[in-house]
Curated annotation (Swiss-Prot):
This is Trehalose-6-phosphate synthase. D-glucose 6-phosphate binds at residues 10, 77, 131, 301. Homotetramer. One of its GO terms (molecular function) is alpha,alpha-trehalose-phosphate synthase (UDP-forming) activity. It is an enzyme of class 2 (transferase). Keywords: Glycosyltransferase, Transferase. The gene is otsA.
Length: 474
């Protein structure tokens, strides 16, 4: 039986309990436990890159991690992955800060990781690469003679040609992506956007619906919407409340709660969300004193100016809205710029009447799915969801909104707050059914199954591919 080798920018610590891990970690651990194998990635620490890999083995899984130098971390991670790819893939070209040394560092680190992984590989290993930090990784492995089946899954959106082609190195990135045998995306829109970008660069031959040839390489594209662990989340949500949360729930028993949580990021649409809530207070005054909106947004990438700007903007907006609409004994908006334990959040989800998830652009958004899974089926809350979240393709029984339209979001919030119990139960049941069917294990099993069906590349085909070129289209 072939081993599974997973490569991601970061690896979850071997001693981290699956229930406290994020969605990616849960899916990867499930796949690795089923097949046995290796999880390879950055340790999260800076230091001497020449040090031997740190290896930890538990059961049939080996964790192998490495350090990065300060320069490599800065160029590969901060200045290219997060200052170029992240904003561009989330349709924010205005925030892209392309620097040639950062691009060189991005390629250099991907080559370095390929060098470190190469001695660990076996001939029949199946290799699964994750996310935008590692777009060139298959290219680097192929250069080193690796003919194994290599799959790639992109967790964030893939932009349309008008956005992607603005990147100075777009053509190189597209050619490198063709070195994968299987390219997985969150949504059909992302898959088609990739093919549109590639078609603008070179000729793409499609042999069947999702099997293609471009740049002399044969590969498949497919959609794999990532899921969650609904049973585990329901268990966490239904458990006893900590004393402080139980007291808060009692104090708010006559108040309807609107709740949001995500890390502080410009892609999440937080300023637009605050303005939509203000529109609710302005246009539907009957809710004054009877609702409370809580936004939890822990700082991420706090050293980046764009993130500092959005934090200050939210602080100002929260103060302004509370000053304008607040009353003695009633604060309409609570904004908390701090981290909360994941299990505690599931309990807060459960007693919230409305889950407000309105990113401007998101690959999937697991918070939306977690909110649904955490609800009491007999008395569920209502999900208000952005049409630009990947989850909107599956959770069609949510109240789907355009996050740029504050009046539409306000109207959806009013509808959610006044929705009948029968409608809430019906909508929740439909969404929960989808979430249970397409859970995290279904996601990884589908991807691995499809990757296994691909015939490995031969040394002869690799050599033949080296001389196959296609001109750019005018």
């Amino acid at each position: 039986m072939s081993r599974l080798v997973v490569v991601s920018n970061r690896i979850a610590p071997p001693d981290e309990h699956a229930a406290s891990a994020g969605g990616l970690a849960v899916g990867i651990l499930g796949a690795l436990k089923a097949a046995g194998g290796l999880w390879f990635g950055w340790s999260g620490e800076t230091g001497n890159e020449d040090q031997p890999l740190k290896k930890v083995k538990k059961g049939n899984i080996t964790w192998a991690s490495f350090n990065l130098s300060e320069q490599d971390l800065d160029e590969y991670y901060n200045k290219f992955s997060n200052a170029v790819l992240w904003p561009a893939f989330h349709y924010r070209l205005d925030l892209v800060q392309f620097q040639r040394p950062a691009w060189d560092g991005y390629l250099r680190v991907n080559a370095l990781l390929a060098d470190k992984l190469l001695p660990l590989l076996q001939d029949d290993d199946i290799i699964w690469i994750h996310d935008y930090h590692l777009l060139p990784f298959a290219h680097e492995l192929r250069k080193r003679g690796v003919n194994n089946r290599i799959g790639f899954f992109l967790h964030i959106p893939f932009p349309t040609p008008e956005i992607f082609n603005a990147l100075p190195t777009y053509d190189t990135l597209l050619e490198q992506l063709c070195e994968y045998d299987l390219l997985g995306f969150q949504t059909e829109n992302d898959r088609l956007a990739f093919l549109d970008c590639l078609s603008n660069l070179t000729r793409v031959t499609t042999r069947s619906a999702k099997s293609h040839t471009a740049c002399g390489k044969a590969f498949r594209t497919e959609v794999y919407p990532i899921g969650i662990e609904p049973k585990e989340i329901a268990k966490q949500a239904a458990g006893p409340l900590p004393p402080k949360l139980a007291q808060l729930k009692a104090e708010l028993k006559n108040v309807q709660n609107i709740f949001s949580v995500e890390r502080l990021d410009y892609s999440k649409g937080l300023p637009e969300r605050f303005l939509a809530y203000e529109a609710l207070l302005e246009k539907y005054p009957q809710h004054h004193g009877k609702i409370r909106y809580t936004q939890i947004a822990p700082t991420s990438r706090g050293d980046v100016q764009a993130y500092q700007d959005i934090r200050h903007q939210l602080e100002n907006e929260a103060g302004r809205i509370n000053g304008k609409y607040g009353q003695l004994g009633w604060t309409p908006l609570y904004y908390l710029n701090q981290h909360f334990d994941r299990k505690l959040l599931m309990k807060i989800f459960r007693y919230s009447d409305v889950g407000l998830v309105t990113p401007l652009r998101d690959g999937m958004n697991l918070v939306a799915k977690e909110y649904v899974a955490a609800q009491d089926p007999a008395n569920p809350g209502v999900l208000v969801l952005s049409q630009f979240a990947g989850a909107a393709n599956e959770l069609t029984s949510a109240l789907i909104v355009n996050p740029y339209d504050r009046d539409e979001v306000a109207a959806a919030l009013d509808r959610a707050l006044t929705m009948s119990l029968a409608e809430r139960i019906s909508r929740h049941a439909e969404m929960l059914d989808v979430i249970v069917k397409n859970d995290i294990n279904h996601w990884q099993e589908c991807f691995i199954s499809d990757l296994k069906q691909i015939v490995p590349r031969s040394a002869e085909s690799q050599q033949r591919d080296k001389v196959a070129t296609f001109p750019k289209l005018a």
